[in-house]
From Swiss-Prot:
Belongs to the TrhO family. It is an enzyme of class 1 (oxidoreductase). Pfam families: Rhodanese (PF00581), Rhodanese_C (PF12368), UPF0176_N (PF17773). InterPro entries: Rhodanese-like_dom, Rhodanese-like_dom_sf, Rhodanese_C, TrhO, TRHO_N. The active site is at C184. This is tRNA uridine(34) hydroxylase. One of its GO terms (molecular function) is oxidoreductase activity, acting on paired donors, with incorporation or reduction of molecular oxygen. Catalyzes oxygen-dependent 5-hydroxyuridine (ho5U) modification at position 34 in tRNAs. The keyword Oxidoreductase applies. Transmembrane segments: none annotated. NCBIfam families: PRK00142.1-3, PRK00142.1-5. SMART domains: RHOD (SM00450). Its EC number is 1.14.-.-.
Amino acid sequence: MSEKIRVLLYYKYVSIENAQEYAAKHLEFCKSIGLKGRILIADEGINGTVSGDYETTQKYMDWVHSDERFADLWFKIDEENQQAFRKMFVRYKKEIVHLGLEDNNFDSDINPLETTGEYLNPKQFKEALLDEDTVVLDTRNDYEYDLGHFRGAIRPDIRNFRELPQWVRDNKDKFMEKRVVVYCTGGVRCEKFSGWLVREGFKDVGQLHGGIATYGKDPEVQGELWDGAMYVFDDRISVPINHVNPTVISKDYFDGTPCERYVNCANPFCNKQIFASEENETKYVRGCSPECRAHERNRYVQENGLSRQEWAERLEAIGESLPEFVGA
């Protein structure tokens, strides 16, 4: 039996001087111990997800904690059967979370060390979910929500996190006087967004401390009131959260049956994320539309080495055709 792999999810807002130099040093250490993952380092802090065996991840956590700036950094740990990443990336960015405030005339960025919402533990957050006078906002991207979310949470009509401030301003009259509670995967986005809500004048703002990842591990709530699975930005794609009465809420793009398997459309110029079973991925050559299925650079066709005849036969089976100039 192969050794278990640990996946570490973490962040911390803290001032990092010479952050670019620190990012290079960080990458060098990670590679020296064989760690895999993706880490963002900015002047405002660090945000990462990494994976490795027990010894490797323990070395990494000990090394990070040995730096007084990160002595109290909170690692959220999952155990898996295989690596969640194939390579090691450490990038320097201007921010570890980009809310897009300065880009969209929303004044200056938020410093969560100065302004942020009240921290709620899993039990308190569950109580908020059941409170009719509390508005619960999902701050993640649309494709994350579609895979899984808290029961009763509002799905803002946005595609990504940077569009959220404008959506709130457009709809603030609906919940300005109510208590507003927000959540995200591990907490890093909510630290900044809840602070922005406070600055916008919302009087009672809370956030799920440690994010969905922590809620699912809490021995008391055990992920209850979460529907579906949680989207993660690594090779796992999704992880279970509700250990009381789990459900599948996402549906196969092609036939509407329950499905939690995310794939990207095979047309590289589309790349839309869709739910699809292996059977339907094969049947529809992973294309989300007739145009994508017949696109000359269809990646499914290339990856599976389909001949032009095999490709054409797949499309004919679903009532479509391959243009003469494609694959000729």
